[in-house]
Structures are given as structure tokens and as C-alpha cells.
Amino acid sequence: MCGSNDNFDSNTANTLAVSLTRSVAKVSLNLTLPNGADLFTVSAIKLMNVAKKLYYVESTAPTTSAELTDYTSDNSNTITWYIPENKAGTTSLTDWKDRYEGNAPATATYILIEGSYTPQNGTARDVAYAIYLGDNDPADFNVTRNTKYTVNASIRGTNLDDGRVLVGKDLSAAGTRTANCYVVKTTDANKWYRFKATVRGNGAQTAEDISYTGAVIPAGDKISPVKAGLVWETRDNNGTIHTLDYVGYSRNGYIVFKLGSAPEGNAVVAAKDGASKIL
């Protein structure tokens, strides 16, 4: 804690009252799991993009990505963190549902709840929920010192139209480079997967350019898909057993797919614009 009082005279005896304020913010998570036929099993709860540095007085400078770290907590339903301030900034958002990756500042602090969701009479799917911190305003993403943030989160489904919901195991989670080809195991309990689909070619954000046509694709050449679809797949049993049962596009920039019942196979999926043109 810290404080100050400028009303001080060094030539006389002084009795000073100094108001102290906390140098950190308190973040509390209260997690409620489904209480019906659906089942959600938590695998990890993380606090992402936490500032590493703590200053005696309030900082006005934005935090850089190099000054951030991540916290991993236990999987209990009630967790409290004490963290330094993070001036991630504000946006023009007006709807709480739009607070997700791509709309939020890259350095904004958020809670990531990971686990396996099994809907009633459905198959298990890996899923993560991202909840960004900020003031009582959809546009604000700042974490301010001497402030308490209470997040009451209730898990209620895996809606692909909600950008805060990340359905499927993330195949592009290793770093900024994604691939144009992925291999997954059909024997895993999880049948749902996702990968980033906002950059052409192999998705590299670096100077490496790869194009299946042989033409040059500028590094980081971004696209803005509206939907995704199946282009081609192998099928078993005279075409009745599919490699993929579902292909879709989520609002947060991922193509999401669900494995079919085929024990092995190949498939091609594509990101598309609003006119169904392949991007």
C-alpha cells in the first residue's frame, strides 16, 4: 500500500494523516457449473496477460506484451488473485458479448476457463471460455489498482456464435504460426477441434510465405471469413460414414470441425466470405 500527504512542515512538529491505497487489484472468480443433464469438467483455470511489474504510484503508460505473464490456478470454483494494474486501454465496444479476441486489446487481462463439455446425449468436446477484465463498461479493458473485480461465471453451453466461447481443441495453440494441414487422432474422447483461419497460406505471421499455388502470399495477409464449409472428404461404407460431421466458423476467427465416425480419413475445409467464395 502507498499514500502521500503534502501538508508537511519540516520546521515544526507534525501529526500527519496519510490515506493508503492498495497497489494491486483483487480479482475474484465464482464459477457455476451446469446443474442439468449437461456436464462440464474443468481442466485448467488461468489468468492471462498479467502485468509483471508493480509501481509505487499509478502508471499511465500502457503495458507491453513483454511485460506480461500468465497465472495458472487450481481448478476450484472460487479463486482469488492479487495482480498489478494493467492499462490495456479502451475500445468502441458497446455490447458485452463482443469482448473477445480480435476485438479486445492484445495486452488485455482475461480469465481463461478450460475443460471438457458433454451436452445431454452428445459427445465430449474440449472448450474454453475467455472472460476479459475491465471497468463496468464493455469498452473498458483496464485493470486498475485498488479495485476489486468480481467475475460470476456460469457455464451454460458451447455456442459458436459467442466469440467468448472457444469450442474444440486448439490445433494452432503452439504459437503465431498455423499450418495448412493438421493430423488428429480419431480415438480421443474429444471429437471437436479448431484452428485459426484469419491469415492466408499457412497462417504464418512472419516473413515466411507459403502458397499451394506457387504464387507469392504476403506475410500476414489477413482475411475476414464469415463462414466455413466442407470442400471434400473421404467416406467409408459406400459413403455413409463421414470423416467430418460438422464444419463451421466461430466469431473469434476459428474454423471448428467435429470428427465423424470413420476410423480414419482425409478432409478439406475452407474459409468463405458472405457469398460463399473460398478465401
Give the role of each language-model region:
Residues 14-16, 149, 253-255:
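Short strand-edge motifs at loop-to-beta-strand transitions and within beta-strands
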Residues 263-274:
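A short beta-strand micro-motif common to beta-rich folds, especially ectodomain repeats
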Residues 168-243:
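Solvent-exposed, low-complexity, repeat-rich "mucin-like" stalks and linkers
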Residues 62-86, 215-252:
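Low-complexity "stalk/linker" and mucin-like segments enriched in Ser/Thr/Pro/Ala/Gly
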Residues 102-106, 260-265:
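Surface-exposed, short loops/turns at beta-strand junctions within beta-sandwich domains
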Residues 277-278:
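Hydrophobic or amphipathic alpha-helical targeting/insertion segments
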Residues 1-10, 14-19, 26-145:
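Tryptophan-paired
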Residues 132-176:
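Low-complexity, acidic Ser/Thr/Pro-rich "mucin-like" tracts of secreted and single-pass surface proteins
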